[in-house]
Structures are given as structure tokens and as C-alpha cells.
């Protein structure tokens, strides 16, 4: 026996039923759909229609809204930054900005800038220029000897 002579056992693969191909097939004429009515027509299902019962999408309450003023920050964790520094993709000498993070492959798209979060540990002293940072991230960066400059944030005195 050769590989090109292999074949299935008889009846191992059942052919699919081709409906509407003559009455002798047992599934001809109406094709197993019965006679007349909504369900016998093509494009039968009406999405969400439950036979007159109040459909689920109308039974459940409306919820929430999309805030058009919400800021869409790209999130970067300190652990990832430390890994990039150790891999040689980030230098600690110059300030770390959005462009530097994008070049290092840590950020893809950032509509409203980058937000720094404290997951992981940072041992290198780095200066960050970012749009936002969590209090824990600022504390961790300053503990490592670095600094966080929040760009675009109004100083407290100017906010009055």
C-alpha cells in the first residue's frame, strides 16, 4: 500500500444533503421547510424577533453613554520600562517622552498621550515627560531617583 492509494472506509464520510434538487431526494420541492409561511421564505430569521414576545434587547434597560470628553491614554507600566532599559531599547540619560516610548516599541497609538502606571519595579533613575501618571508611579520613580513631569497639566495656581 502506498500513500497515494489511501482511501476512506465505505460510509466514513457522509455527503451533505443538497436540498431542493428533485422530489426523489426526499428533500426536494420545499426543501424541508414545509409549506408557505414566514419561515419557508428566504432570509427567514428576523434578528432579535422572538415570535411576538418582548425581545431580550428591549427587555433589558439602556445603560451608560460614551463620554466625548474622555481622555484616551496609552498606558505604560514601570516594569515594561525597566525591561526596555535592561534590553538597551531605552536610554536613561535623556527624558523619556511619547516619541521615545514609541521608538522603543512600548507605545503604539496614543491619542491623548501616555499615562504612567506603577505595575512592576523601576531601579533606573529616569526623567519622564508624560500626559499623566498615577500617584504610586510618581512615588516609585522618585524613589528610584527619577522625576515625572506631567505635560499639559495646569499648575494648581493657574487653575484658579
Curated annotation (Swiss-Prot):
Ranges annotated as biased composition (Basic and acidic residues):
1-18
Residue pairs linked by disulfide bridges in the UniProt entry: none
A Pfam short name: Ribosomal_L27A
Report one GO cellular component: cytosolic large ribosomal subunit
Q: Where is region (Disordered) located?
A: 1-52
User: Which of UniProt's keywords are assigned here?
Assistant: Ribonucleoprotein, Ribosomal protein, RNA-binding, rRNA-binding
Q: Where is the signal peptide?
A: none
* Top-level division of the source organism's lineage: Bacteria
Q: Which InterPro entries match?
A: Ribosomal_uL15, Ribosomal_uL15/eL18, Ribosomal_uL15/eL18_sf, Ribosomal_uL15_bac-type, Ribosomal_uL15_CS
Q: Where is the composition biased (Gly residues)?
A: 21-35
Gene Ontology BP, a term:
translation
Which Gene Ontology MF annotations are present? rRNA binding; structural constituent of ribosome
Q: Which family does it belong to?
A: Belongs to the universal ribosomal protein uL15 family.
Fetch the PANTHER family from UniProt.
50S RIBOSOMAL PROTEIN L15, LARGE RIBOSOMAL SUBUNIT PROTEIN UL15M
Q: How does it assemble?
A: Part of the 50S ribosomal subunit.
List, alphabetically, the NCBIfam families matched.
rplO_bact (TIGR01071)
Q: What job does this protein perform? A: Binds to the 23S rRNA.
Q: State what protein this is by name.
A: Large ribosomal subunit protein uL15
